[in-house]
Amino acid sequence: MFDKMKDIISEQLGVDANNIELDTSFKNDLDADSLDLFELVLAIEDAFNVEIPADDVSNLDTVEDVIEYLKGLGLEA
């Protein structure tokens, strides 16, 4: 799941996948703004066939936060 997540983030935010770690913060480390995050969430929803409510998005600061959230929805790593 981490590799797939890195690919999505790299494509959506235009960053090198090698610079993405579990503790990478979307805002602080990748300089993502609210529009970037919105587009990233849409891409994650499409890739994993899930829906992430807007209220939950604000709690997803790092790559690991998203992976743990997806695991909580029953997706396997």
Predicted regions: what they are:
Residues 31-41, 63:
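Amphipathic alpha-helical interaction surfaces in cytosolic regulatory modules
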Residues 1-18, 72-76:
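Thiotemplate assembly-line natural product biosynthesis machinery
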Residues 2, 37, 50:
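Functionally critical, cavity-lining and gating residues within the transmembrane helices
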Residues 48-77:
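C-terminal structural segments of small proteins and small subunits
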Residues 12-31, 48-59:
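Phosphopantetheine carrier-protein modules
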